[in-house]
Amino acid sequence: MAGNFNQIEKIGDYTVITASMNYASTTQLLAKRGMDILGGLVGCIITLIVTIFVGPAIYIASPGPIFFAQERIGRNGRKFKMYKFRSMYMDAEERKKELMSQNKVSDGMMFKMDFDPRIIGNKILPDGTKKTGIGQFIRKTSIDELPQFWNILKGDMSLVGTRPPTLDEWDKYEPHHRARMSFRPGLTGLWQVSGRSNITDFEEVVKLDTQYINEWSVKGDIEIIWQTAIGVLRNDGAM
């Protein structure tokens, strides 16, 4: 089923040719979008219920907005606002620069730390003991990702796809890295269920994302959703 597919689209004031690494029929695309709409609706209802409990806990621990909106890169380089429950302190983005030397992904294409002090409640006590709070809890259980069901319902994202990079990560991409964004970004994906947060080699992420795009099928998406659900229940790592 794999194959290249190009189409002419309007992005802002520009008319451009966009590309897909895997051609899918209209029926297949409608099936995927149908899954997204259904999943998005159910997910938004769950998110509203969870907000009743998680929202106050976030605000008490770190006064400020309970939701976090960040500009991300979507399909074919489009920018969109991605939503999460706020799991970090308000100055997290500013502090990120100070912590880059501790980034587990050496090439800087993603940012991962073993114990991130920007997460709400995270602190190292004088005796070296590490203390966590609501921020670590909602990240470990992937509750912080729930607001992205709104992105899915809007069409910015899909239930399954490639994870959307931040603008600074996108600027560092080489041409073969950008190919992973020829598909609509997803809440979960192949690399998440292949190692979830444990993967620290960005080239491995690109390899798995490219494999997902080339071998995409509705059945494959269902399998990834199932594996993601099992991973979350087992606390295999944050999405």
Q: Where do the PLM segments sit?
A:
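Short, glycine-rich, amphipathic interfacial segments at transmembrane boundaries or analogous
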Residues: 5-8, 68-130, 188-209
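A hydrophobic, helix-centered structural microdomain
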Residues: 26-95, 151, 218-239
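A short, structured surface patch at a secondary-structure boundary
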Residues: 108-183, 224-232
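Cytosol-/stroma-facing membrane-proximal "stalk/adaptor" domains immediately downstream
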Residues: 5-6, 162, 167-180, 184-185, ...
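Gly/Ser/Thr-rich helix-start
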Residues: 41, 56, 65, 75, ...
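Glycine-rich flexible loop motifs, especially short His-Gly-Gly/GGXG/HXGH segments used as catalytic or interaction
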Residues: 3-41, 66-70, 196, 200-218
